[in-house]
Amino acid sequence: MTNIRKNHPLMKIMNSSFIDLPTPSNISSWWNFGSLLGACLALQIITGLFLAMHYTADTTTAFSSVTHICRDVNYGWVIRYLHANGASMFFLCLFIHIGRGLYYGSFTLSETWNIGIILLFTVMATAFMGYVLPWGQMSFWGATVITNLLSAIPYIGTNLVEWIWGGFSVDKATLTRFFAFHFILPFIIATLVMVHLLFLHETGSNNPLGTSSDSDKIPFHPYYTIKDLLGLMLLILLTMTLVLFSPDLLGDPDNYSPANPLSTPPHIKPEWYFLFAYAILRSIPNKLGGVLALVFSILILAIIPMLHTAKQRSMVFRPLSQYLFWILTADLFILTWIGGQPVEHPFITIGQMASILYFSLILIMMPVVSLIENKMLKW
């Protein structure tokens, strides 16, 4: 008798990806975040679809349509807050997923890593455009400030900004196109996720030791399906706690005021997950320099495989590199905090020091320390 799971054209793709997939036997809970990101993406697409049924992408009605969703639509408030806080959970899982890749040397799987960087940029663009849609004060001014950064590009900058706006300021045309892009991008992300998995399954997963797992693999199901399910339950618990007890904890109170082009909020700041990059942007007085630092703060991930000077792939047996990794983590926390503070002393200086430390750690300290650790192997 033929096994439909292994022979059916569609089923065998699912089977080789999620059931009979040979997986390293020792991957830890840090490997759970890939599946959690998939769950977050599914949540965002489903809740987003229901929100789009009631939302109107027009400057006169956008704000009131979001209010209508929260007040008049059945469980509209749950859907709206699941979508808003789901984005926060998405980025939390994303940062941990990237951190795990850095710590355990998963960036040596270059195709998977590069698709991951493209995914990160796409998710960030999607989240930014989504934040503009409620058309509150922070939505409007956030859109104005961030899109205006493109005007720093020499010669074509101003034309480029006006082309993106669809006019001479952020207005109806901007909101309409941002809604269109915000709707389509998650499906592009889902396609990129499939490519990400395709490349991952070409090489197989890394493991905490950074060694070859070829001699010791186990089937993905039931071992890791159960393990991922536990992670999913914990993620649902955290998300629902946030949604039901403190839905506005991570939001900005200014976004409960309708957009007013004539009144600038005292402190314009993005959502928490962009604050680290925003702090790096603000730490450089020159506009073009700030924009380049902002882009490079994320694009730097692409050159990490080239900066890998260690003989060992993982940081598990490299205590000095571990020390620098956790300093980098602490530095990102500091940058996130600084990004939410006003531009005044001492925050400016702290932000500049943290930005210098961020680039120094990745570009200089980590490669040098890895070389020292290589020498230590011979002692």
Curated annotation (Swiss-Prot):
Q: Which residues bind heme b b566?
A: 97, 196
Swapping residue 191 to A leads to an effect described as: In strain: Isolate DUPC 6271m and Isolate FMNH 85134
Read off the SUPFAM superfamilies from this record. Answer: a domain/subunit of cytochrome bc1 complex (Ubiquinol-cytochrome c reductase) (SSF81648), Transmembrane di-heme cytochromes (SSF81342)
Enumerate the Gene Ontology biological process terms.
Answer: mitochondrial electron transport, ubiquinol to cytochrome c
What's its membrane topology? Multi-pass membrane protein
GO MF terms held by the record: metal ion binding; ubiquinol-cytochrome-c reductase activity
Read off the PROSITE patterns from this record: CYTB_CTER (PS51003), CYTB_NTER (PS51002)
Subcellular locations according to the entry:
Mitochondrion inner membrane
Where on this chain does a ubiquinone bind? 201
Cite the entry's keywords alphabetically. Electron transport, Heme, Iron, Membrane, Metal-binding, Mitochondrion, Mitochondrion inner membrane, Respiratory chain, Transmembrane, Transmembrane helix, Transport, Ubiquinone
| Function in brief | Component of the ubiquinol-cytochrome c reductase complex (complex III or cytochrome b-c1 complex) that is part of the mitochondrial respiratory chain. The b-c1 complex mediates electron transfer from ubiquinol to cytochrome c. Contributes to the generation of a proton gradient across the mitochondrial membrane that is then used for ATP synthesis.
Q: Tell me the subunit arrangement.
A: The cytochrome bc1 complex contains 11 subunits: 3 respiratory subunits (MT-CYB, CYC1 and UQCRFS1), 2 core proteins (UQCRC1 and UQCRC2) and 6 low-molecular weight proteins (UQCRH/QCR6, UQCRB/QCR7, UQCRQ/QCR8, UQCR10/QCR9, UQCR11/QCR10 and a cleavage product of UQCRFS1). This cytochrome bc1 complex then forms a dimer.
Q: Which family does it belong to?
A: Belongs to the cytochrome b family.
Q: What is this protein called?
A: Cytochrome b
Q: Which organism is it from?
A: Lemur catta (Ring-tailed lemur)
